[in-house]
Regions:
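Conserved ABC transporter NBD signature motif
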Residues: 50-61, 65-66
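ABC transporter nucleotide-binding domain
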Residues: 165-256
Length: 288
């Protein structure tokens, strides 16, 4: 897929294949093309080049059919603040053609999944940010979709609320729902995704399980060297001379693949490599 906005190439030759029943994470910084990709998968934005098939439906020709089997949780809160949780879910049950006889049960199920039963008759204006986010998820699940698209599902939420959303997403995976999630939170991708595709400048530059990405691009261990700026500059120069992959990590220089270093390695603290190390090694960018 390719998509341009004027001179800006938002998505540049992206190939994506999401198998059923997995949580697939698109990980990248803001501007990597994640949200544009999500909009193309719902036919809100049309690709300039390439073909898109979602759940066996060709887009954009069969986008209406695909949307009936797809749940979408947008990045931005677009809830009607004057309606109650129950009213919003009832409206969307009708829009998604849930049979009349099954609507009440569908609404109750969605409220239960999102842990919003006690707030069923509360208007949206009175809900906390975390509750509103859970309501967005419940709205996307009202019709029992085969595929759920989550665009930055926990952006702007505090850590406790983020954990609650992660538990909800874990429940979707346990139910066999296919989840495609975009995120710029490394911890979120590492925690939730079965497979992670790292995006940069509109392309997928690496793909695999979190553990596979770490092994392939950061190794098993990282050596962190602390000290004054002058010492860190010397360590960076030493790493460059010996071809050791390294990066600045807060007040330290982190050297990848520490398990392979020879006796010339400086003194420092060793730790297991993680997905952040792999991401920075791949892209050269630091993200959350």
């Amino acid at each position: 897929m390719r998509k341009r906005f004027g001179e800006i190439v938002a998505v540049n030759g992206l190939d994506l294949d999401v198998p059923p029943g997995v949580c697939f994470g698109l990980l990248g910084p803001n501007g990597a093309g994640k949200s544009t990709t999500m909009r193309m998968l719902t036919a809100q934005t049309l690709a300039d080049e390439g073909s898109i098939s979602v759940l066996g439906y060709e887009l954009p020709r069969e986008s209406k059919q695909s949307r009936l089997e797809m749940g979408v949780v947008p990045q931005l809160d677009n809830l009607d603040v004057e309606l109650t949780c129950r009213q919003i879910l009832t409206v969307f049950a009708r829009l998604y053609r849930v049979p009349r006889a099954e609507r009440d049960a569908a609404v109750t199920r969605a409220l239960e999944i999102a842990n919003l039963v006690p707030r069923a008759d509360t208007i949206v204006r009175e809900l906390s940010g975390g509750m509103r986010r859970r309501l967005l998820v419940a709205r996307g699940l009202i019709h029992r979709p085969r595929l759920v698209l989550l665009d930055e599902p926990t952006v702007g939420l505090d850590p406790q609320i983020r954990q609650e959303l992660w538990t909800l997403i874990d429940g979707l995976r346990a139910d066999g729902v296919t989840v495609l999630m975009s995120t710029h939170y490394i911890e979120e991708a590492e925690r939730l995704a079965d497979t992670v595709a790292v995006m940069s400048a509109g392309k997928i530059i690496a793909q695999g399980t979190p553990a596979e990405l770490v092994r392939a691009h950061a190794g098993e261990q990282v050596l962190e060297v602390y000290g004054p700026a002058e010492h860190l500059a010397e360590v960076s120069e030493l790493a460059a001379e010996h071809g050791w992959a390294s990066r600045r990590s807060g007040p330290a220089v982190a050297i990848m693949r520490a398990e392979t270093l020879d006796g010339l390695a400086p003194e420092g603290a060793r730790r297991p490599a993680n997905l952040e190390d792999a991401f920075v090694a791949l892209t050269g960018e630091e993200i959350e």
